[in-house]
Amino acid sequence: MAFEFEITSDTSNKYLKEKTRDYYLELASGWVDTAPKPAIVDLNGATVWDDSVTGLGTKGRWGDLLISKVEQKEVVYVQPRVGWAGMSLSALVDKYDKNLTLFMPASKKISDHQLICVERGAKTKFRRIAAMPVLNKYAKDYADEVGGFFVPFGLDHELVVAAGVASTLQQWGDRPEPKHIVSVVSTGVLCRTLQIAFPNAEFHGVAVARNLKAGEIGR
């Protein structure tokens, strides 16, 4: 079965509509990425950045600043069947002595990524849904009810963007700024943040999970 995505022709980056690169760098001022280093290797003429070797995923480093500032004890997020965010949050709540509740779409068999979240101690709530926005509402309503902190889908939060820009520059080091960057695009947090970190690079995105709206794909 072939799937088609609706992708906007708008090339704006919603993170830069009212804020600048300097704003995000200032927001993360003093924060240092202490997560395990990614593998940044040359492969067939390309430079590959691999965060999977850390066991955290990219959001495991980018989400650190946000979770470090969360006052609530319980963190609430929506974990799809495939995705590293729940695993990343599992590590971060352990680091900052918090609890994690994950709302997951129910199916006949739990996915590998969801299972890892369970193994890492996340409290799970499975719901049968027609679309992810419905599950997001369940999760947000639950967070409001228990006084927890609801993390937007994809960790779409300015502190995550700020840490993402700072972390990328810290880990990239003194390498020349890349001319071309190829990235998957789901919520677009990764791609939009990298565009801020590397303002002169040309970006090529591969949509993998959802329709993309104005402001989400950037340049």
Model-derived features: positions:
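Active-site-proximal loop->helix
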Residues: 65-66, 87-130, 196, 213-219
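A short, small-residue-rich loop immediately preceding and capping a beta-strand
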Residues: 72-92, 96-104, 180-187
